[in-house]
């Protein structure tokens, strides 16, 4: 190939690539973005007293579950597992609530993305109900799901070791630097993970009901996390920022409002701290949909036209509770 031919072919290749790139841009417009403020109009109507709270008819059922998030579907799973089926579930503002997901497209190659919770840490040894649920849903495998759970590699994702970008470089863990206070705090947390009371109960366990009831630990519930940190002499701004962030993320309040027990429980109660987490393309919507299948939840367009429900199969309706009033062992 002489020089003229080489330059001709190079120009042709460059022109073809440029044309293809422009064609790709023309045919693949970025999707438009819209914000769905779930429940906002109804919340404003309630705030402004624009909705009547008096009921127009009375209906009853064995069990009414409000919402369709993790707590609601877990409750339905437990009831069905124990033989109850006369259950009505009010879906709430969004299907699957805090486990909701978004699907773009209707084919097998559709894009799925979580709009709610997106991962689940591997359940601790004390979280036997969660392990049992995951076993029922086929997520935990093996003959000893409660004591020796086996997970599919397709369901596990390892967290990156380096995920904080600060001062021009990546840092291991979740903090840009490990100062003396930070090291001391996490060394203390490492001991708390194995701390037990005189009865052999873990000081901090998940679920929290299995945590020690001993006064030496429960007295931490009477002071704030911020007060405890000051008592222990922690002054690092980086550590304080991180602990406040964690509390706001999990509890909705910072270290000045969250109790010391709750703050320490966040770090000390989780088993498998550095293990891979369970996640899917649509986040925990994957578990929510599996729960619906396990329960056999059938969707209804409206409430059944009867005064007393005798559902043979759990059902759901697109409804929201505006007012809940306790009345003995029942609610209105």
What are the roles of these predicted feature ranges?
Residues 62-89:
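N-terminal Rossmann-like FAD-binding beta1-loop-alpha1 element of flavoenzymes
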Residues 97-128, 210-212:
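Glycine-rich active-site loop/strand segments that organize a redox cofactor
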Residues 1-62, 81:
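Extreme N-terminal leader/targeting segments of oxidoreductases
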Residues 135, 143-257, 273:
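Mobile amphipathic helical/loop "lid" adjacent to a hydrophobic cofactor/ligand pocket
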Residues 203-330:
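Active-site/ligand-binding neighborhood in enzyme catalytic cores
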Residues 77, 98-102, 131, 176:
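Short, solvent-exposed loop/turn and secondary-structure capping segments
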Residues 80-105:
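Glycine-rich FAD pyrophosphate-binding loop
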Residues 126-182, 295-331:
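Feature captures the FAD/FMN-dependent oxidoreductase FAD-binding
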């Amino acid at each position: 190939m002489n020089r003229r031919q080489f330059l001709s072919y190079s120009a042709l290749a460059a022109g073809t690539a440029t044309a293809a790139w422009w064609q790709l841009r023309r045919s693949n417009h970025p999707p438009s973005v819209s914000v769905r403020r779930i429940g906002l109009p109804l919340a404003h109507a309630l705030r402004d007293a624009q909705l009547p709270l008096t009921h127009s008819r009375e209906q009853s059922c064995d069990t009414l579950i409000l919402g369709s998030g993790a707590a609601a579907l877990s409750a339905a799973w437990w009831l069905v597992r124990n033989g109850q089926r006369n259950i009505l579930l009010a879906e709430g503002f969004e299907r699957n609530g805090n486990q909701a997901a978004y699907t773009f497209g209707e084919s097998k190659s559709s894009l799925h993305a979580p709009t709610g919770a997106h991962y689940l840490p591997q359940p601790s040894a004390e979280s036997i109900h969660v392990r049992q649920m995951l076993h029922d849903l086929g997520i935990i495998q093996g003959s000893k799901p409660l004591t020796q759970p086996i997970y599919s590699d397709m369901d596990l994702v390892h967290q990156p070791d380096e995920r904080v970008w600060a001062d021009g470089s990546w840092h291991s863990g979740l903090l840009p630097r490990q100062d003396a206070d930070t090291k001391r705090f996490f060394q203390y947390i490492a001991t708390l993970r194995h701390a037990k009371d005189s009865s052999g109960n873990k000081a901090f366990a998940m679920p929290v009901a299995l945590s020690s009831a001993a006064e030496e630990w429960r007295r931490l519930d009477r002071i704030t996390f911020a007060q405890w940190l000051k008592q222990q002499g922690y002054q690092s701004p980086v550590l304080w920022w991180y602990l406040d962030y964690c509390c706001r993320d999990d509890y909705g309040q910072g270290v000045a409002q969250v109790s010391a027990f709750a703050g320490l429980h966040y770090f000390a109660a989780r088993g498998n701290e550095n293990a891979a987490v369970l996640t899917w393309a649509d986040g925990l919507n994957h578990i929510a949909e599996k729960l619906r299948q396990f329960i056999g939840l059938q969707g209804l367009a409206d409430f059944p036209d009867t005064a007393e429900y005798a559902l043979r199969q759990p059902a759901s309706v697109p409804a929201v509770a505006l007012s809940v009033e306790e009345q003995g062992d029942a609610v209105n």
